[in-house]
Amino acid sequence: MTLNLDRPAPLRPKTQPKVGIVSLGCPKALVDSERIITRLRAEGYQIAPDYAGADLVLVNTCGFLDSARDESLAAIGEAIEANGKVIVTGCLGAEPEVIQRAHPKVLAVTGPHQYEAVMDAVHTHLTPPHNPHMDLVPESGLRLTPRHYAYLKISEGCNNRCSFCIIPKLRGDLASRPIHHVLMEAEKLVAAGVKELLVISQDTSAYGLDIRYKPETWRGSEYETRFLDLAKGLGSLGVWTRMHYVYPYPHVDNVIPLMAEGLITPYLDIPFQHASAPVLKAMKRPGNQDKVLGRIAKWREQVPDLAIRSTFIVGFPGETEEDFQILLDFIREAKIDRAGCFKYENVAHAESGKLEGHVPEEVKEERWHRFMTAQAEVSAARAEAQVGRTLDVIIDGPGEEAGEMIARTQADAPEVDAVVYLENAAHLKAGDIIRAEITGADDYDLYATPA
């Protein structure tokens, strides 16, 4: 942790001290923010809804892409201007000199998942209440997501060394949480009303590798700290469970039967990033197009409704038109249900910035539009195939039209995927899971009525 030695004396509010929090970046950072606010509330701090009502502001930053770094620095500046007392944490906090050079008035800077350092910084600059109010904190902790779904982080860091990524430099190597800790947390979340668990990490399929799949006991049974046993344990809780950030390793095949049994939601988030062998090699990513296509076909033989979400990068250094055509052919043949596409940009300290053959910005832009057009065609065909079917959907909340609710199928994760516009549904509430008759579709979203 880096402190500003010219800091003012700590505040000692006459009422309960209030901390504002700004959470940027991915769901993994959101989980970090949830853990921090849980600790703050456990010690009696209030969480302020805005800058004006806060005695101090905590900014949880992202530092993965240059655009994310710029957004984080802008958010820090906004917090300083609006409040004046700012502590910075998160991925960009791993480079304190960058933050302090841009914003010398920050009170302290801590790195990612340094919860104790964050609390120490808060204590230094905002005196904690005399009597902690532990009873104010629910057993499941405090969350920044709606009541009916929650992110479940199973590990920190990553052992992969993708040439475009600096996550291992920011968050370190893979560090898996003990499986009984993860399953107990999931159990508490379900008891608190969560209907959907979203399993996240940097590499979910590598879970447990760093601790040699150490066995632990949960509910009287032994579970090894590995992807398959995690899926079995979570599948016993009776809620929707999504697996995010899964690499296409062979052992992922073992989880597909659990989806066929209805224990795990038939959904895999696999960041393929590309399909061309030369580009994947330059990215230092695993993947063989023919093998991957064959495995996807086998998965869908077992689970016809399996939805696959992925992310891709276009315009990676050295990417040729032929490479790009291979990528387009792949998303069409694999029938990728949901896809995010990003134009390559250099990341500070990433190896890819040193590669030859950087693609001009106008070519990146043109390829991005072609990718999105091709993906829209795939998604539209997948969506149209649902019309006339009756599917389970989970309610997220009210829509803009009278009597309308926004819902999702099992093929759609919150925030990033498609939605279902459910008519005549005013009697339903967030978290309800119902059967819905699909009456229409557009490129991505569905339209339905309660069955």
From Swiss-Prot:
Domain Radical SAM core positions: 144-381
GO molecular function: 4 iron, 4 sulfur cluster binding; aspartic acid methylthiotransferase activity; metal ion binding; protein methylthiotransferase activity
Intracellular or extracellular location(s): Cytoplasm
Reported cofactor(s): [4Fe-4S] cluster
A GO BP entry: tRNA modification
Family the entry assigns: Belongs to the methylthiotransferase family. RimO subfamily.
EC number: 2.8.4.4
The name this protein goes by in its record: Ribosomal protein uS12 methylthiotransferase RimO
Cited CDD domains: Radical_SAM
InterPro entries noted in UniProt: Elp3/MiaA/NifB-like_rSAM (IPR006638), Methylthiotransferase (IPR005839), Methylthiotransferase_CS (IPR020612), Methylthiotransferase_N (IPR013848), Methylthiotransferase_N_sf (IPR038135), NA-bd_OB-fold (IPR012340), Ribosomal_uS12_MeSTrfase_RimO (IPR005840), rSAM (IPR007197)
Function according to Swiss-Prot or TrEMBL: Catalyzes the methylthiolation of an aspartic acid residue of ribosomal protein uS12.
Top enzyme class: transferase
Primary site of residence: cytoplasm
Domain TRAM: 384-451
MTTase N-terminal domain sequence ranges: 17-127
Binding positions for [4Fe-4S] cluster 2 per the UniProt entry: 158, 162, 165
Catalytic activity: L-aspartate(89)-[ribosomal protein uS12]-hydrogen + (sulfur carrier)-SH + AH2 + 2 S-adenosyl-L-methionine = 3-methylsulfanyl-L-aspartate(89)-[ribosomal protein uS12]-hydrogen + (sulfur carrier)-H + 5'-deoxyadenosine + L-methionine + A + S-adenosyl-L-homocysteine + 2 H(+)
Cofactor binding, per record: Binds 2 [4Fe-4S] clusters. One cluster is coordinated with 3 cysteines and an exchangeable S-adenosyl-L-methionine.
Binding of [4Fe-4S] cluster 1, residues: 26, 62, 91
